[in-house]
Design a protein with these regions (language model features):
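N-terminal secretory signal peptides
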Residues: 1-14, 24, 28-29, 35-42
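Hinge/cleft segment of the Venus flytrap/periplasmic-binding protein
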Residues: 44-78, 216, 332, 336-496
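Extracytoplasmic "Venus flytrap"
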Residues: 50-71, 78-99, 112-124, 132, ...
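Short, solvent-exposed amphipathic alpha-helices that sit
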Residues: 92-106, 191-195, 223-242, 256, ...
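Short beta-strand elements in bilobed, periplasmic/extracellular small-molecule ligand-binding domains
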Residues: 105-116, 212-213, 238-254
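Hydrophobic alpha-helical
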Residues: 123, 137-156, 231-232, 246-312, ...
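Flexible loop/hinge segments that line or gate small-molecule binding clefts
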Residues: 147-190, 306-312
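Hydrophobic alpha-helical segments within soluble ligand-binding/sensing domains
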Residues: 181-211, 257-258, 305-309, 325-344
Length: 496
């Protein structure tokens, strides 16, 4: 490969520069401070529940009926699509934004994007986008406090709504009417268990037991926080000699991760391995450890498969990360919403919670050996994707002003395929070479261990009770703690 063709490492400064440019651009292009139908944001919980809350589809006949009843556009119509995110200071958030813009433009829609940091900004931004013609909105990590009101706004204006990391045991799509239709969130226990098994196996082989454990957040995307901590519990059961230490929250980002790392260094410095809740906060914590002379990079694992982490993996400075093909994960929601807008599809009740499949990325050779010796290779959820090829063909585009990821999201739209004579492709043209499993998704309610959406709800509710703060140091203590778990809290390492 020529020198000019080699992937260039993106610096933290470049990432934040991109985020700032993106934020400035979207602010200028999308926010018009106009309100649609007036909404009383101080209404009681009872008042906030839309009149259409009972509209759900449980059969194919009801699916077709609701698709036609709720449609708000005609096939081929050019309407607005709005994306609101809680920040753009993380590679995941930027790639999610970029891929939704790409998908919207491929489908011939007017893309609008914005950052919202307060409850009022979430509400006002949604209203502004609807006033500008948005017929579908997507929210990345919305605060749960605004969901009843946002659903009411969308219900009153016949606008479809989807989310990433937008549910808890108390709040699900469909709870506030028929227009919050989908939440797309990986089951992060499935994304934690395999890479952590690999890390603990490597630590065992090297006589290491002191594992620095960083959690995610008690306030943002808590559904992922609790899933991740469940995955930690699942892996730990196979390596009871490990001591989990630190337990700080990295708040999903580089700066939060660095603060968490500094807090742990104030307690001790003899850490021998590191599990972080996602790549961004883990990289931040590693920077603090390195500055303090604690170099445990090759004994580090996390989840997301962001560019800078993947580059460190190939350099031997990071063991493994588990990815959900972020650009595919982000972009695929757009054609699904388009199909709902034009009446081509509507989810059944148990299809409203969705999750992406997952792949692990590490150094070729090492990750396979660890998978064999740990036994994780026998788990159907375990899959290995090519790290170098992902960098060169997908992740490197993250640095571009307006990237074109290797997907044609029209192929995921039932309506667009019919309109244009295309063949439907669940992988959106991305194939399975770069992402053997993660160019795909599934419905958690249909997993064997759940079997219904209500079982998923009870599971997530129990996880929020027992795993929002998992600050246990020894496996003996964890075993004792687990005696409290109710039967609805599923600890089986089976996602089939």
């Amino acid at each position: 490969m020529k020198e000019d063709d080699k992937p260039k490492k993106i610096t933290r400064r470049q990432a934040f520069k991109m985020a700032g440019a993106a934020a400035a651009g979207i602010a200028a292009s999308s926010l018009v401070r106009r309100f649609v139908k007036p909404v009383n944001i101080f209404a009681s919980t009872k008042e906030k529940e839309p009149a259409g809350a009972a509209l759900v589809a449980t059969t194919e006949a009801e699916r077709k009926e609701l698709a036609q009843k709720l449609k708000n556009a005609k096939p081929g119509e050019k309407f607005g699509f709005g994306h609101i995110t809680w920040h753009l200071a993380q590679e995941y958030a930027i790639m999610n934004y970029q891929s939704q813009q790409q998908a919207a433009e491929q489908l011939g829609l007017n893309f609008m994007g914005a950052v919202a940091t307060t409850d009022s900004e979430w509400l006002e931004t949604a209203e502004s986008m609807i006033a500008k013609g948005a017929k579908a909105l997507h929210l990345n990590v919305p605060p749960m406090s605004v969901m009843p009101e946002l659903c009411r706004i969308c219900d009153e204006n016949n606008v479809f709504l989807s989310t990433n990391f937008g549910y808890t045991g108390d709040v699900f799509p469909g709870d506030y009417g028929p227009r919050w239709v989908v939440d797309n969130t990986p089951l992060s226990a499935e994304q934690t268990y395999p890479p952590l098994m690999l890390l603990m196996e490597k630590m065992r082989q090297n006589g290491r037991t002191k594992l620095l454990h960083h959690q995610a957040s008690k306030t943002a995307a808590t559904v992922s926080t609790v899933y991740i901590n469940l995955g930690v519990f699942m892996a730990w059961k196979n390596y009871p000699e490990m001591h989990l230490l630190g337990h700080q929250y990295g708040e999903w980002g580089y700066e939060g991760g660095r603060k968490a790392g500094e807090a742990c260094l104030a307690e001790r410095t003899d850490y021998e391995g590191f599990w972080g809740a996602n790549d961004s906060q883990t990289k931040g914590a590693l920077s603090a450890l390195i500055d303090a002379g604690v170099n445990i990079g090759p004994f580090t694992a996390s989840r997301d498969m962001e560019l800078t982490t993947a580059q460190d993996v190939l350099k031997g400075e990071f063991l493994v990360t588990s990815g959900f093909a972020i650009p595919y994960f982000g972009g695929r929601t757009v054609p699904m919403l388009y199909d709902m807008c034009v009446g081509a599809w509507y989810p059944l009740r148990d299809e409203m919670i969705q999750a992406g499949r997952l792949d692990c990325y590490g150094r070729p050779g090492e990750i396979e050996r660890l998978a064999e010796s740990s036994g994780i290779i026998k788990n159907p959820s375990f899959s290995i994707g090519p790290t170098k090829e992902n960098i060169e063909k997908i992740l490197i585009h993250f640095k571009e002003d307006k990237p074109e990821y290797p997907y044609d999201f029209r192929l995921l739209s039932l309506s667009k395929c019919e309109e244009l004579g295309l063949k439907y492709d669940r992988h959106a043209g991305g194939g399975t070479e770069l992402a053997p499993l993660s160019h795909n998704y599934y419905f958690p309610s249909k997993l064997r261990k759940f079997g219904s959406l209500e079982a998923v709800r009870k599971h997530v509710g129990a996880l929020h009770k027992y795993f929002l703060d998992f600050n246990i140091d020894t496996w003996e203590e964890a075993e004792e703690y687990a005696k409290q778990f109710p039967p609805e809290l599923k600890t089986e390492t089976d996602w089939q």
